[in-house]
Amino acid sequence: MTPEIITIQPARVPNAVRMPLWIRQNLGSDAHYGKTSDAVQANRLHTVCEEARCPNRGECWSRGTATFMLLGDTCTRACGFCSVKTGKPDHFDADEPRRVAEAVMALKLNYIVLTSVNRDDLADGGAGIFAATLRELRLRDATIGVEYLTPDFRQCQDDAVRIIMDALGELPDGARSDLVWGHNVETVPRLYQTARKGSKYQRSLDLLAKAAQQSGVEAKSALMLGLGESRAEVLAVLRDLYSAGVKRVSLGQYLRPSLNHLPVLDYIHPEVFTEYEHEARAMGFAWVKAGPLVRSSYYAEEQQGDTHA
């Protein structure tokens, strides 16, 4: 039976349901957790693990992996679900790519996820920093796996794709020339006006389609559930993503960062996530992760070596 479609409520309203046991998770305290934290702080960097209060931070950091957030810690948009601070960024750090690469080398990672805040104040949306970080990483380690999780590059998608693909094509002989390019649609189209102000569903699909068309690039996206979307809406988004050329997808539970953010309307049972995973695989997605604590970069390192040439 299709669940009732619920209209999302404004911030400060209590969650509609209590958090179930399957959601709760302790912060990791493995020795590698401290090593990852130290490397991030020593290089004056930001991770989405911290800024977005990811529930898997302890687990991932204890494995010695992290998702580095480029272009500072201030976003030019204000999505209703996100805890990253918003405002007018006060600087542009051209040295950030070098410091990210040095932190990655210090941690001896073989797969790195790079994301960023939205920087609508920049002509290229920040694409140049993504490209420069890719170069810095593969100049130091020609075999390192790199995954992007980019904004939608509003007003400059074509330029952003060109900048990034130029960097990929100019790497030294012997360096990997592949890339996973992720961009999250986050939610169903009906909820964009409330959950993703400043973003457009079709714009996100357009970027994913452009990324999927590039040689050596595999497109990836993610959905968070629990904002009142219906099963039919979720399946429709999965079909749209697959039609756009996306081959990798993840689905996870929305967890409210604070009372100033959108309330959780439903906690999706793990069995329902399993059903969505089966549906996505049946549609043809090559890689699927679905579960309450899954995030777009969760166990991303498992994917390395799978991108097409």
Regions found by a protein language model. Give the residues of each.
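Conserved alpha-helical substructure of the radical SAM core
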Residues: 86-113
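Active-site beta-loop-alpha junctions enriched in small/polar residues
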Residues: 85, 117-119, 149-154, 185-188, ...
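A short acidic, helix-capping loop that chelates divalent metal ions and anchors anionic groups
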Residues: 118-123, 189-195, 257-263
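Conserved beta-strand positions in the central sheet of alpha/beta enzyme cores
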Residues: 113, 181-184, 250, 289
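Conserved glycine-rich "GG(E/T)P / GGGxP" loop and the immediately following alpha-helix
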Residues: 112-132, 228-233
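Active-site mouth loops of central-metabolism enzymes
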Residues: 66, 70, 81-94, 147, ...
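Auxiliary Fe-S-binding modules of radical SAM enzymes
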Residues: 1-67, 102-105, 132-143, 159-177, ...
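Canonical Radical SAM [4Fe-4S] cluster-binding loop centered on the CxxxCxxC motif
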Residues: 13-23, 59-96
